[in-house]
Every structure is written in structure tokens, then in C-alpha cells.
Amino acid sequence: MQYTGSQYFGEYINGRMEGSAEYILPTDTRYIGEMKDGMFHGEGTLFFPSGSRFDAIWKKGLVVKGKYTFNDGLQYEDKHWHYCDSYDRRFYTEICYGLKPSGISQLTNMDPPRRIPLGYYDCGDGFYNPTTRVIKDYRNRFLRNADDDEHEWIVRTCRKGWLPMPKQKS
């Protein structure tokens, strides 16, 4: 644990993590559930720093069945997912609380939206610097390096931090 920055609170059997436990990753993602032979095994939940969670049944470290719930309570559906698509373009908060009047459009599910640093992209779990290809969480802690596919997706899809628009002369 000391080399990875992780923390483990639970039992050991033959030097392996086993039984009911809490495992905290360096990113502050927490797993609370069953372990067997050092792996997630049985029922367990991943709690993410963003407030979202993934409840699952695990077998030898792999997901058998799971359910992802966003921090606002929206549950992901892997079939017939119509969230914020061409079928229904509303954000979850707009579904729950209604649309705003014309001229006060909502840009993200979070309203008001998060301020994005100049030249960076908001990729959902942090800010992405396209020059260094590094994604840091919203508290400026390293999350990961983006591979070519993720870089292309972020640049094509995500909101970018721009300079404020100059005021028009009346």
C-alpha cells in the first residue's frame, strides 16, 4: 500500500486482503465491500470523489453485474439510454426541476457551470490540458494521461475554457 498510495482497512488471510473491507485508492475513490484473495469479490460499491457511485457484484476483481448512479441521482441505463441525446436533450436537473426561460439556457447539468481554465477542457471528471494531455481532477490532482482516442473525444466533444467575449459598444 505504501508504494501505491492506497489504504486498506480490513482483514488479511495468508497475507492477502480478504473479507469485508474498505480500500481507498490514491484518487480518493473508495471501495467498500467484500474482498477475496486480494481482489474485489462479492458485493461492493465504488464511491467516487465526484459523489457518484458504482454498486456491483464482483468475481475475482471483475464486474459481474453493476449499476452506476451519478452524483445527482441519475442512474445510467446501458440499453435505451436517452439522456441528453437527440431524443431528449435536457439535462437531468432540467428533467427534475423544469426548463429555464428563453435566454437563460443551461450549458451543463451543473448550473451555473464550472469555470474552465483558459485553453483547458472540462471532460466530466476534471480539466484536460491538450498540450500536456494530462487530466487533473477539479481539485488539481493528477487523474490520468489521455491516450489518442480520449484526446480526440475530449477535443471534439467537451466544453473548452475561452477568453470572455468583449463587450459590444452600444
Swiss-Prot record:
**Pfam families attached here?**
MORN
Q: Which SUPFAM superfamilies match?
A: Histone H3 K4-specific methyltransferase SET7/9 N-terminal domain
Q: Where are the MORN repeats?
A: 8-30, 31-53, 54-75
Summed up, the tissue specificity of this protein is: Only detected in testis (at protein level).
Location(s), subcellular: Cell projection, Cilium, Flagellum
Grouped into one coarse class, the protein's main location is other
Q: Which GO terms describe its cellular component?
A: sperm flagellum
Database matches in SMART domains:
MORN (SM00698)
> Which terms are listed as keywords in the entry?
Cell projection, Cilium, Flagellum, Repeat
Q: Which InterPro entries match?
A: MORN, Morn5
Protein name, as recorded:
MORN repeat-containing protein 5
Organism for this UniProt entry: Mus musculus
